């Protein structure tokens, strides 16, 4: 159980409601979110935004940009709720910021599914020090 929690915390850099985000990713891709995406490429997991290695890595880049736009809620601490209806994620928050955070997580989960063909197991655990800085803005 402790190992599961540690892996969940690695998932996309401790941001967001980690449990909900992990469930979304699993529901959309069928992959273990922590081991498949927790340290993928240059943008998944802890650290700043870098030049994406592929479309899957770009999903994480865009996710970090989405979180950067949030106001009035804390993606690290705050939690939201969502439901899985007819194989679709439905964000169910009344709080506008929590709803937006849920939408950010929904978008990255769908992005991962849509880019499963670019997923490269060799990039699953990437040393971030070999990642290039990017001048691209969110």
Curated annotation (Swiss-Prot):
It is found in: Secreted. One of its GO terms (cellular component) is extracellular region. One of its GO terms (molecular function) is calcium ion binding. Residues 1-16 form the signal peptide. The keyword Disulfide bond applies. It comes from the Eukaryota. Disulfide bonds join 42-131, 44-60, 59-111, 65-138, 66-104, 73-97, 91-102. Residues 121-133 are annotated as: Important for membrane-damaging activities in eukaryotes and bacteria. Its main location: secreted. The record marks 121, 124 as: Important residue of the cationic membrane-docking site (MDoS). One of its GO terms (biological process) is arachidonate secretion. SUPFAM superfamilies: Phospholipase A2, PLA2 (SSF48619). Expressed by the venom gland. The record marks 127, 130 as: Hydrophobic membrane-disruption site (MDiS). The record marks 128, 133 as: Cationic membrane-docking site (MDoS). Pfam families: Phospholip_A2_1. Keywords: Blood coagulation cascade inhibiting toxin, Disulfide bond, Hemostasis impairing toxin, Myotoxin, Secreted, Signal, Toxin. Snake venom phospholipase A2 homolog that lacks catalytic activity. It shows myotoxic and weak anticoagulant activities and induces local edema a few hours after injection (5-10 ug) in the hind paw. A model of myotoxic mechanism has been proposed: an apo Lys49-PLA2 is activated by the entrance of a hydrophobic molecule (e.g. fatty acid) at the hydrophobic channel of the protein leading to a reorientation of a monomer. PANTHER family: PHOSPHOLIPASE A2 FAMILY MEMBER (PTHR11716), PHOSPHOLIPASE A2, MEMBRANE ASSOCIATED (PTHR11716:SF9). Belongs to the phospholipase A2 family. Group II subfamily. K49 sub-subfamily. This is Basic phospholipase A2 homolog Ts-K49a.
């Amino acid at each position: 159980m402790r190992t599961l929690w540690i892996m969940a915390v690695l998932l996309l850099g401790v941001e967001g409601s980690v449990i909900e985000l992990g469930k979304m990713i699993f529901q959309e891709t069928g992959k273990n979110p922590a081991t498949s995406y927790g340290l993928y490429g240059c943008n998944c997991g802890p650290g700043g935004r870098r030049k994406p290695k592929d479309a899957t890595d770009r999903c994480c880049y865009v996710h970090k940009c989405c979180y950067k736009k949030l106001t009035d809620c804390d993606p690290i601490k705050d939690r939201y709720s969502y439901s899985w209806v007819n194989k679709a994620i439905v964000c169910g928050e009344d709080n506008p910021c929590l709803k937006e955070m849920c939408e950010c997580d929904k978008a990255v989960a769908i992005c991962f599914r849509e880019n499963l063909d670019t997923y490269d197991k060799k990039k699953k655990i990437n040393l971030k020090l070999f990642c290039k800085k990017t001048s691209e803005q969110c």
